[in-house]
């Protein structure tokens, strides 16, 4: 059989991955609604081998990068929708956050063309001001955390095009109306048994410095996400009355 030929030529590992890709392809062909959480879970279980899922995700990312070459608009939209609703959540679950963001942003580019270019233009026009703002916001936090004897990594970023577009739709506002364009990530470097305590210590330091919005507190330390993700999220009012997610 073909599987035996592959195994003989390339070994058991490659044969197993090819078999997984075939199983997933068969599942695709039988399922009309692939943009659901049920199908996502089914797809991962059918793959049986995480390498199969990684190959599929990489393949979809490559397809999205070449999508402008596809002339059939319906086919293009289907590929983009699957990237947004099927592959981006899988990438997120695997901790592949850059890939998740790229898949989502490219999906907006093809599904919401005008919105994508409007947001991109606005982001490009305000980049230097945003970078300066993030640096000013981070500096005093870094000083306070260092004074507290904490070991940490801190970095700031502007939300992705996809994230901003979702907020614009949810809040029914223009780009200027999105109130938390910025996100700061603080990663604590400490023994596992001290993680929760130090996370809450960082939370306390930040909310002493900046006014928090209690409605925006997300506690995934007490109840971690299903993929094992543990963190605290809070939105605070930074300089110039701008909201920042930490």
Residue positions per predicted region:
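Nucleic-acid processing machinery
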Residues: 26-42, 47-53, 60-245
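Short amphipathic beta-strand/extended segments with alternating polar/hydrophobic composition
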Residues: 12, 245-246
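Histidine- and acidic-residue-rich, metal-dependent catalytic cores
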Residues: 2-28, 84-89, 93
